[in-house]
């Protein structure tokens, strides 16, 4: 099983391409952006995800933890010049220097987390060699890393290393040659061979002093019978540990519980696994994250297929009127058989349970309808 750390924007794509048996840890330094990151990953629907809100230095205690680290490091943003005039006005040689130093600090902080033989993917959205090739040379020389070549097609029009006197592989996506804005990446391997989960001892020593969570935890207000009722909402409930926090329940893959414990020892966890439900009175109110999750048992709830206009109204958190034949109680709304979220149908109206902070605010809507041929987990 592998553990991957991804910083910021590449997280949903990373989760899509990671092999089975992988855990993604997605970190965002800025707190309000970490909430947006959690929202995006919730909508993506995979349970093998932990979202954190930490400075890279906070990861230093997780020695030899990650198999792969993808760093989308803060940069001077020269690749944004074409579409963002503000990026041009904010650029300066001094800012390049600040970014260059920050990038090296980030790599220094997270390098101990990478397992021996692990992979570091370094990326920026800027052009200058100081923040790109010069930093790759520095990582190579400072940490003994091997810069790895990638298999690419000449049809992609990727530009290589631009640093004079160096020929290590690097990849530039320049906007006049490739589709998209400016982008740089290089891939490096940490020297050595991993000898397994060397962080396991750290977990055991920390767990001695922590309060129990999940199985065996104190769960005031939630009985075992109430908790077991939630198992029916999952396609394969035995794969998950149901974790109670007050009246809220989340589910996390059992295969990654040791990793979660290690992360909790050092980091601020914004979200882990799937938000399942909140106990209100004697009834469970399903969380929106459950509707989005590929772990959902689709037969656990009554369904109501709705049209495009109703779907937009729902996502704007407006009132939704269901058909007279729609069942009462909690109903899972679908559009083209894809789950949108829950409502509570009380007959004369359906209470919209879509998260208030996620609602569509823009008045613009695309004219066409997006067709999704298949959705895979």
List PLM regions with ranges.
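Mobile active-site "lid"/loop adjacent to the S-adenosyl-L-methionine
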Residues: 32, 67-108, 125-132, 157
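S-adenosyl-L-methionine
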Residues: 29-64
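Short, small-residue-biased leader/transition segments that mark boundaries at the very start
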Residues: 1-7
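Helix-to-beta-strand junctions that scaffold the AdoMet/dcAdoMet cofactor pocket
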Residues: 19, 114-116
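Conserved SAM-binding loop of SAM-dependent methyltransferases across substrates and taxa
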Residues: 8-19
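Class I S-adenosyl-L-methionine
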Residues: 66, 119-122, 127-250, 255
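Conserved SAM-binding motif I beta-strand of class I
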Residues: 23-28
């Amino acid at each position: 099983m592998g553990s991957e750390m991804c910083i910021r924007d590449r997280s949903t794509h990373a989760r899509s391409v990671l092999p089975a048996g992988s855990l993604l840890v997605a970190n965002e330094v800025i707190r309000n952006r970490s909430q947006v990151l959690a929202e995006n990953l919730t909508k993506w629907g995979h349970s093998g995800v932990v979202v954190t809100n930490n400075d890279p230095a906070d990861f230093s205690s997780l020695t030899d933890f990650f198999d792969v680290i993808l760093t989308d490091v803060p940069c001077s943003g020269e690749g944004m010049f074409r579409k963002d005039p503000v990026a041009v006005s904010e650029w300066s040689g001094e800012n390049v220097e600040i970014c260059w130093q920050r990038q090296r600090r980030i790599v220094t902080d997270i390098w101990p987390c990478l397992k021996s033989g692990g992979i570091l993917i370094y990326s920026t959205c800027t052009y200058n060699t100081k923040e790109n090739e010069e930093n790759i040379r520095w990582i190579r020389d400072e940490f003994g890393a091997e810069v790895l070549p990638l298999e690419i097609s000449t049809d992609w029009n990727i530009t290589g290393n631009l640093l004079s006197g160096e020929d290590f592989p690097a990849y530039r996506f320049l906007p006049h040659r490739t589709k998209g804005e400016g982008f740089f990446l290089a891939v490096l391997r940490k020297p050595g061979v991993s000898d397994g989960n060397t962080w396991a001892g750290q977990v055991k020593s920390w767990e001695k002093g922590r309060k129990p969570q999940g199985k065996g935890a104190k769960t005031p207000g939630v009985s075992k019978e109430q908790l077991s009722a939630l198992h029916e909402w999952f396609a394969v409930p035995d794969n998950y540990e149901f974790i109670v926090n007050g009246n809220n329940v989340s589910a996390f893959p059992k295969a990654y519980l040791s990793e979660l414990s290690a992360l909790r020892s050092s980091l601020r966890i914004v979200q882990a696994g799937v938000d399942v439900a909140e106990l209100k009175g004697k009834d469970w109110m399903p969380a929106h994250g459950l509707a989005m999750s590929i772990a959902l048992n689709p037969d656990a709830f009554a369904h109501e297929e709705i049209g495009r206009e109703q779907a937009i109204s729902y996502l704007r958190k407006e009132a939704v009127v269901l058909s007279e034949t729609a069942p009462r109680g909690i109903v899972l709304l679908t559009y083209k058989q894809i789950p949108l979220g829950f409502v509570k149908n009380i007959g004369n109206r359906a209470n919209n349970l879509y998260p208030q902070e996620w609602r569509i605010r823009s008045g613009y809507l695309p004219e066409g309808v997006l067709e999704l041929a298949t959705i895979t987990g």
